[in-house]
């Protein structure tokens, strides 16, 4: 997630004026024109209609609620977003056959987003909890380096560890370290300020965001295709622009060409368990025949494709 500056709605503006009035008498000035006022939304959109519902779905599952419509809501969760949340939780191994798993219960006990909870639980198996705690803390706070730090999250991790090693005080890293420390305490893990493998950062990010595994597009060194089918771009001069594989931790939500904000390089050897063999049969609209292939894929990323002769037309997708 990222902080964005957006226009206020009319009801929010009125509410803030009222709050100021409760402190003391005075005058509230609206710092925009009447024309701008006329274009403002009348009311705020309820948060549940715009938010990622993964945390809510995990909460309800831990309470034994499988159908959100069995509850009374001021604004019911959109079914499209709810289905997407369940798919995310299934991919994070929190759900199986519509029920919460033991792994999901462990995720729910951690005070963070399910994606980060899954990452830290997997990091425990890899003996990388301290690194995962640093990653989670950095992702929960505003980027401490901003654009000057490039898109490599490893630059932030190294800066955080330097902050700790030199016992610096103040600044953005103080808050980030407090969060990281709280996660280390939950896992009873000692702080680690030693040099680390940047590819291990990428591996951990794939646990949190498996759909954001990204492969450099041939001939477009700064463009990457994600496992979810989207295309995202790094800056042409960025250190990671020429990496073959990235794990993307943060990018914008625009359709079409997205922009990568934070990522880490990936070792392709760490992706072996994610490769799936998929048989694809499609109708060729130009030739009027069937095209079939056996693909090795990571989501929408095709690693290898072998044509299949004599496809079965009953399996046309």
Regions found by a protein language model. Name each.
Residues 2-40, 54-58:
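Conserved segment of the helicase C-terminal RecA-like domain
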Residues 1, 34-317:
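Second RecA-like catalytic domain
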């Amino acid at each position: 997630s990222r902080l964005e500056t957006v226009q206020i709605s009319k009801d929010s503006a009125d509410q803030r004026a009222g709050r100021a009035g409760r402190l003391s008498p005075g005058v509230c000035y609206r710092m925009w024109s009447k024309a701008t006022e006329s274009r403002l939304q009348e009311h705020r959109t309820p948060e549940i209609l715009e938010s990622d519902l993964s945390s809510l779905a995990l909460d309800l599952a831990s309470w034994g609620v499988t159908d959100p419509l069995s509850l009374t809501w001021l604004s019911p969760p959109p079914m499209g977003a709810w289905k997407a949340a369940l798919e995310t939780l299934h991919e994070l191994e929190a759900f199986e056959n519509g029920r919460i798993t033991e792994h999901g219960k462990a995720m729910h006990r951690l005070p963070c987003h399910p994606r980060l909870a899954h990452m830290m639980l997997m990091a425990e198996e890899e003996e990388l909890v301290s690194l995962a705690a640093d990653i989670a803390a950095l992702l929960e706070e505003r980027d401490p380096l901003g654009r000057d730090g490039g898109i490599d999250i490893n630059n932030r991790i190294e800066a955080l560890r330097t902050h700790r090693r030199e016992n610096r005080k103040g600044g953005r890293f103080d808050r980030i370290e407090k969060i990281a420390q709280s996660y280390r305490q939950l896992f009873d893990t000692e702080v680690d300020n030693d040099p680390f493998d940047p590819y291990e950062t990428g591996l951990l990010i794939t646990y949190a965001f498996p759909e954001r595994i990204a492969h450099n597009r041939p001939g477009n060194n700064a463009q990457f295709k994600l496992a979810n089918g989207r295309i995202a771009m790094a800056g042409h001069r960025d250190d990671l622009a020429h990496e073959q594989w990235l794990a993307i931790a943060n990018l914008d939500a625009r359709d079409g060409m997205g922009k990568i904000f934070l990522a880490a390089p990936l070792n392709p050897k760490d992706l072996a368990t994610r490769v799936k063999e998929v048989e694809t049969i499609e109708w060729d609209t130009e030739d009027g025949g069937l095209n079939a292939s056996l693909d090795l894929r990571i989501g929408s990323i095709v690693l290898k494709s072998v044509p299949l002769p004599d496809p079965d037309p009953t399996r046309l997708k």
